[in-house]
Amino acid sequence: MNTIANTIKQRLSLREPLAEALDVLTRLVDKLSLSKPERQSDKEAEAVAYEVYLKEQLQRVKEVCPYCKDFERDFPSFAFSIATGIGKTRLMGACIAYLYLAKGIRHFFILAPNLTLYEKLMRDFGDPSYEKYVFKGISEFVHNEPLIITGDNYNKARNLFSDNQIQISIFNISKFNTESKEGGKKGAPKMRRLSEYLGQSYFDYLFSLDDLVILMDEAHRYHADASKKAINELRPILGLEMTATPTDEKGKSFKNIVYEYNLAQALADGKYVKIPTIAKRRNFSRGNMTDEELDILKIEDAVSVHEHTKLHLEMYAKNNNQP
């Protein structure tokens, strides 16, 4: 029994699928070295050593998850395929809490695929007063609150070199790998430029960390060549990929899935997601209608329901002085 994992499950009130996913993570990280191979002056020798390291780590993983065929990145990386609405963000919080409390890992880098999710993640991880704060109940984070570093404040970040504070960097993928344009000229992304405060770029700072873990929200967005290359260059000790769509841009399934709880399972369980209601006619008989005619009828019915609902909402707004 893993006491730390069980405590996190209870404190965060994890749903059953999320608790199962956390259990998988605990077994996997016990198998991994969670360290980078030593750097070598001979780059060719270093590349060979790193390839051997990855193969060895994959073999260890297969002892727990034989269906994990490949990391798909230049570092150990696991995909959690979990249906939308189950709580992938909460699982990320649970994973961070476990890796910190059980393994002493202090540096985490979270990637968001767009501005909307970036802003949501900043609040989920950085606002203890927020009702959906992901670490609510983790007492260790009350006395040692995580330092949240974002794509907006990383150049002004303080306490980066604290010996015991957990650091969570949250970046929108566009700031992470998109070339900047100043004066009409393309240049390196700002996070790759020299920071006077750090004495190096923030990217180089992350690369230099011996315990960096990267978490990818909507991970299917980061399998394109540019994103994948930029992430690989960070060389973290571990990657955790969260997605409800575990396929790449070519439609191929991920080879590094270690846990799956898909929409079909969620609908069958009937506990966590709403079952969609489909508008249909009472006592409807298809008769001699063709497939095309039937599709048109379905669309017309859907439009009718939409207009009916819209009318009721407008009436409600007028009657209650709402915009």
PLM features: residue spans?
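Post-DEXD/H (motif II) to motif III coupling segment of the RecA-like Helicase ATP-binding lobe
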Residues: 223-275
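Conserved pre-motif I regulatory segment
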Residues: 1-81
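Conserved SF1/SF2 helicase motif Ia
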Residues: 81-82, 86, 93-119
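Phosphate/oxyanion-binding active-site loops and adjacent basic polyanion-contact surfaces
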Residues: 13-22, 84-92, 117, 255, ...
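Conserved RecA-like ASCE ATPase "motif II neighborhood" in helicase/translocase motors
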Residues: 150-230
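Conserved nucleotide-binding/hydrolysis micro-motifs of P-loop NTPases
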Residues: 115-118, 174-178, 220-221, 245-249, ...
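Conserved interdomain linker/interface between the two RecA-like ATPase lobes of SF2 helicase motors
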Residues: 254-323
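Conserved Walker A/P-loop ATP-binding site and its immediately adjacent core
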Residues: 104-136, 142-143, 174-175
